[in-house]
UniProtKB/Swiss-Prot annotation:
Family matches, as InterPro entries: Ribosomal_bL28, Ribosomal_bL28/bL31-like_sf, Ribosomal_bL28_bact-type, Ribosomal_bL28_sf
Molecular function terms, GO-annotated: structural constituent of ribosome
Gene Ontology biological process terms, A to Z: translation
UniProt xrefs under HAMAP family: Ribosomal_bL28 (MF_00373)
Lineage, uppermost ranks: Bacteria, Pseudomonadati, Pseudomonadota, Alphaproteobacteria, Rhodobacterales
Domain of life according to the entry: Bacteria
Protein name: Large ribosomal subunit protein bL28
Organism of this sequence: Cereibacter sphaeroides (strain ATCC 17023 / DSM 158 / JCM 6121 / CCUG 31486 / LMG 2827 / NBRC 12203 / NCIMB 8253 / ATH 2.4.1.) (Rhodobacter sphaeroides)
Recorded family membership: Belongs to the bacterial ribosomal protein bL28 family.
Amino acid sequence: MSRVCELSGKAPMTGNTVSHANNKSRRRFLPNLNDVTLISDVLGQSFKLRISAAALRTVDHRGGLDAFLAKAKDDELSVKARAIKKEIEKAQATAA
Protein backbone atom coordinates (compact mmCIF):
# COMPACT_ATOMS: atom_id res chain seq x y z
CA MET A 1 0.00 0.00 0.00
CA SER A 2 1.58 3.25 -1.08
CA ARG A 3 1.81 6.25 1.20
CA VAL A 4 -0.09 8.59 -1.11
CA CYS A 5 -3.37 10.35 -0.36
CA GLU A 6 -6.10 9.18 -2.75
CA LEU A 7 -7.80 12.58 -2.89
CA SER A 8 -5.06 15.20 -2.65
CA GLY A 9 -2.08 13.29 -4.02
CA LYS A 10 0.09 14.09 -1.00
CA ALA A 11 3.14 11.84 -0.93
CA PRO A 12 6.26 11.46 1.24
CA MET A 13 8.83 14.23 1.05
CA THR A 14 12.52 14.06 1.90
CA GLY A 15 14.59 16.42 3.96
CA ASN A 16 17.18 16.64 6.69
CA THR A 17 17.12 15.97 10.40
CA VAL A 18 19.31 18.71 11.84
CA SER A 19 20.85 18.17 15.26
CA HIS A 20 21.82 20.84 17.76
CA ALA A 21 25.40 20.47 16.50
CA ASN A 22 24.09 21.14 12.97
CA ASN A 23 24.75 17.57 11.82
CA LYS A 24 22.45 16.64 8.97
CA SER A 25 21.05 13.22 8.16
CA ARG A 26 18.42 12.38 5.59
CA ARG A 27 14.85 11.61 6.62
CA ARG A 28 11.37 11.23 5.16
CA PHE A 29 8.35 13.34 6.01
CA LEU A 30 5.31 11.06 5.69
CA PRO A 31 1.77 12.33 5.12
CA ASN A 32 -0.76 11.78 7.91
CA LEU A 33 -2.86 9.11 6.18
CA ASN A 34 -6.04 7.63 7.62
CA ASP A 35 -8.36 4.91 6.40
CA VAL A 36 -11.82 6.47 6.27
CA THR A 37 -15.24 5.61 4.90
CA LEU A 38 -16.90 8.47 3.06
CA ILE A 39 -20.51 8.46 1.92
CA SER A 40 -21.66 9.82 -1.42
CA ASP A 41 -25.00 11.63 -1.12
CA VAL A 42 -25.79 11.28 -4.81
CA LEU A 43 -25.03 7.57 -5.04
CA GLY A 44 -26.14 6.69 -1.51
CA GLN A 45 -23.08 4.48 -1.23
CA SER A 46 -20.03 4.43 1.04
CA PHE A 47 -16.43 4.26 -0.16
CA LYS A 48 -13.30 3.30 1.77
CA LEU A 49 -10.40 5.62 0.98
CA ARG A 50 -6.93 6.26 2.39
CA ILE A 51 -6.67 10.02 2.67
CA SER A 52 -4.63 12.58 4.57
CA ALA A 53 -6.02 14.42 7.57
CA ALA A 54 -5.84 17.68 5.62
CA ALA A 55 -7.88 16.18 2.78
CA LEU A 56 -10.46 14.94 5.28
CA ARG A 57 -10.84 18.47 6.67
CA THR A 58 -11.17 19.81 3.12
CA VAL A 59 -13.87 17.25 2.28
CA ASP A 60 -15.77 18.33 5.38
CA HIS A 61 -15.28 22.03 4.57
CA ARG A 62 -16.54 21.66 0.99
CA GLY A 63 -19.66 19.83 2.11
CA GLY A 64 -18.95 16.17 1.50
CA LEU A 65 -17.35 13.78 -0.93
CA ASP A 66 -19.51 14.77 -3.90
CA ALA A 67 -18.68 18.47 -3.63
CA PHE A 68 -14.99 17.74 -3.09
CA LEU A 69 -14.71 15.51 -6.15
CA ALA A 70 -16.62 18.01 -8.29
CA LYS A 71 -13.92 20.62 -7.65
CA ALA A 72 -10.92 18.26 -7.60
CA LYS A 73 -8.50 18.00 -10.51
CA ASP A 74 -8.31 14.57 -12.08
CA ASP A 75 -4.50 14.44 -12.06
CA GLU A 76 -4.44 14.70 -8.23
CA LEU A 77 -6.96 11.90 -7.72
CA SER A 78 -6.19 8.19 -7.57
CA VAL A 79 -7.68 5.78 -10.08
CA LYS A 80 -10.29 4.72 -7.51
CA ALA A 81 -11.26 8.33 -6.75
CA ARG A 82 -11.52 9.15 -10.46
CA ALA A 83 -13.89 6.21 -10.92
CA ILE A 84 -16.04 7.45 -8.04
CA LYS A 85 -16.06 10.96 -9.53
CA LYS A 86 -17.16 9.58 -12.90
CA GLU A 87 -19.98 7.58 -11.26
CA ILE A 88 -21.20 10.67 -9.41
CA GLU A 89 -21.15 12.80 -12.57
CA LYS A 90 -23.07 10.11 -14.45
CA ALA A 91 -25.68 9.85 -11.69
CA GLN A 92 -26.10 13.64 -11.59
CA ALA A 93 -26.48 13.80 -15.37
CA THR A 94 -29.24 11.19 -15.38
CA ALA A 95 -31.01 12.84 -12.44
CA ALA A 96 -31.01 16.26 -14.11
